[in-house]
Structures are given as structure tokens and as C-alpha cells.
Amino acid sequence: MTISQAAGNVCTVSALNTKKHQTTNSVDSEVIYLPNTDCTIKSQACLSAFTSYRVGGAADLYVAPRNLEALQASLKYAKEGDLKVTTLGAGSNLLVSDGGISGLVIATRHLRFSHFDPQTGQLTVAAGESIPSLAWAAAELGWQGLEWAVGIPGTAGGAVVMNAGAHNSCIADMLVSAEVLSPDGTLETLTPEQLGYSYRTSLLQGGDRIVTQATLQLAPGADPAKVVAITKEHKKHRLSTQPYNFPSCGSVFRNPKPYSAGWLIEQTGLKGYQIGGAQVALLHANFIVNRGGAKASDIFCLIRHIQHQVQERWSINLEPEVKMLGEFQGAC
């Protein structure tokens, strides 16, 4: 399969031989149907449309299952074809290379359901549910515990994997259990202790297991108006301190305690520094924004430049929070 790219990551679809995974000279992609499901696999799917940075090349193969059975069928298809599997949630904490991703990309954004249990105060959600939407839903019911998460740009599955957090709270604080799917199609329910949580990370990162659903412990019974008001304040604070006028992935670097990554970058004089269409945000230095026409390589090289400059001045190695997918060798 081939990817034709111009400025702004324009992907040209080439056809896929559904039996041998070989390209043809046609520009019309054949459709791959997963047996016993209503799921189809796309070839050469442009990933820029599925990432918050709005950059990146194409996936060799892309599938977005809508239920557990289709997800298991997708993994079986990958195993039988000896395909590498990459999981994609909301694409809000990712940088996909301009060359795209080989193998099969499985998007979990269509895995959707949520259940608020008033007897236990527990919220069970599918991996593809939006974290901000869940925060608003909980607030409107008078359930406390997710107010801080209203500005987290991602899905429940991604939040569980990276231990998403804000305002001194995080997913690990309220997670009861997570259901994960192994490459062989078996399901397992894991506790927070088994997930090995620490700051913005878990044992699921870098692994091949996929989160299918999670159960969170919340606190029902509060006045909905008060919970909504607190949630609105968190959202207002987020909007006033972080850039939302341009595409970004959220925070780029983990905070190297006791310092703030944004403060270190700002004190190094890098606010507003730009490579191509990628810029260190003026509002918050731990954000890199796509000012328009940025390539993944622009963002990657800006990340490396920031790391180098901060290391030179402060002798501190900034560790990226953003996950990089694809090949970046020789990008800078």
C-alpha cells in the first residue's frame, strides 16, 4: 500500500487486495468485511481526521468496532494476518507520524454505553465514552467525583490506560476495576493495584491489551445544581488557562516534580517558538498547537527542541506525555 502526502497531510487512497494485503493500481479501496459482524475494515485510512492534532499519515488498515464481538473479531483478523495492532481512542494524546501506522488500527470510539448504579454509586462505562460527557452526565445527576474531568479531552479507555488527571485528582483514585481484552480474545477484570498506576501511567501503556470498559466509584446524592456549578468552574478554569483555539494534544510533557513542565519551558524562553506550523502555545507553554498546515514532523522536532533546551538550562529531562505512533527517525 502507498501513501501520497503533500503539505497538510493529504492522503491518497490506494486499493487493497482483501486476500493478500497487496496494493492494486485502482484508486478505489475494496471493502473488507469481518465475518459474523457488521464491521468493515478500511485500507489507507487518513488518521489526521481521528487525532486532535489533525496531523498524521494513513493506517494500513483501520476498523472501528461497535461492540465486543466485533472487537474480538478484529483481533482475530489481525492475528490470522500476522498484523501489528494499534489501539486508538479519541486521538487526543497522540502524535501519528507523517508516514502513518502499519498493521491494523483499532478505534474504540464507537464502543459506547454508560450505567449509573444508584445502589452502589458506581458508574460503568465502555471504553469509547467521552470523559467530558460523563462528567456532565454525573453532575446533572448530582453525582460527585468527576467534576475535575470535564476538561479532559479523551475517552474512558484512554483515561484508564494513561491515568488521566487534573486538579490533584486522577482516574486511579476512583477506579474500581477495568475490563481488558487480550490479543487472544480473552477478557480479564483488573483492579487498580494490578494496573500498577503511577503519575500519568499504568502497566497497560505500551502493551497489547485493550480496555473495553471500566467501573468508577462516585458519590451520588448531592444537589445537582451545586455539582453542575463546580463542574462549570473547572471548565471555565480550563478554558482560561489552556489554548483551545488551535488543534493540540493537551499537555505534551509530564510534570517533573516538583516543577511544572510549562513553567520550565516558559522560563527557557520558548513560548511562541515555532517550527513549521507547530508552535509552543502562548497561553500555556506545555501545549504545542497546530497553527495551520503543521506536519507531524514539525511537532516532533519542536518536542525534541524543547527537550534539548530545557536539558541545557535546567539539567532536567522532560518526558513526553503524548504517545508517538509510527516512524519518526530522521524527521529532524
Swiss-Prot record:
Keyword match NADP: yes
Higher taxonomy: Bacteria, Bacillati, Cyanobacteriota, Cyanophyceae, Nostocales
A molecular function GO annotation: UDP-N-acetylmuramate dehydrogenase activity
GO BP, sorted A to Z: cell division; cell wall organization; peptidoglycan biosynthetic process; regulation of cell shape
InterPro entries attached to this UniProt entry: FAD-bd_PCMH (IPR016166), FAD-bd_PCMH-like_sf (IPR036318), FAD-bd_PCMH_sub1 (IPR016167), FAD-bd_PCMH_sub2 (IPR016169), MurB (IPR003170), MurB_C (IPR011601), MurB_C_sf (IPR036635), Oxid_FAD_bind_N (IPR006094)
Known role: Cell wall formation.
Name of the top EC class for this enzyme: oxidoreductase
Entry similarity comment: Belongs to the MurB family.
Classification via Pfam families: FAD_binding_4, MurB_C
Keywords attached to this entry: Cell cycle, Cell division, Cell shape, Cell wall biogenesis/degradation, Cytoplasm, FAD, Flavoprotein, NADP, Oxidoreductase, Peptidoglycan synthesis
Keyword Cell wall biogenesis/degradation part of the UniProt annotation: yes
Protein name listed in UniProt: UDP-N-acetylenolpyruvoylglucosamine reductase
